[in-house]
A protein has these predicted regions:
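Solvent-exposed, well-ordered loop and adjacent helix/strand elements within mature globular domains
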Residues: 1-125
Length: 125
């Protein structure tokens, strides 16, 4: 059932496609410095934040297993593995996808078979 499947993803992670996006109007909306959860960023320092956008099917709001503010461990990307925080939402056309927030000028990249796993190691209590 769906609940068991969501619990499995939360416990074991899942495979996703990883891409990147930049806080610029043509890739976001008219307020590229404000993320979906309301966080305001300095666009020129976007790469320093370690924030990600996730496809809607991964967010609890749309039946997924992640929430804004959750920390995920990303593996399988060669040079982008690490812990990121969920802060933004991708366009509805994407499924099972993670977008890493990068500063303007960073060369685009894509990883087809990366894995995300929810972690609370870095969550502040």
């Amino acid at each position: 059932n769906l609940k068991d499947e969501l619990n499995k993803y939360e416990a074991e992670g899942m495979n996703v496609t990883v891409t990147m996006y930049q806080p610029v109007r043509y890739q976001t909306d008219s307020t590229p410095n404000i993320l979906a959860d309301g966080t305001r960023i300095k666009t020129e320092q976007a790469s320093k934040y370690k924030f990600i956008a996730v496809s809607r099917n991964l967010l609890k709001r749309w039946g997924g297993w992640l929430d804004y503010g959750d920390f995920i461990l990303l593996k399988g990307t060669s040079h982008k593995d690490g812990v990121y925080q969920v802060k933004d939402t991708m366009n509805a056309r994407f499924v099972n996808r993670v977008d890493i927030l990068e500063s303007p000028g960073v060369k685009p990249y894509k990883f087809e078979k990366a894995q995300i796993l929810k972690t609370d190691i870095f969550a502040s209590k």
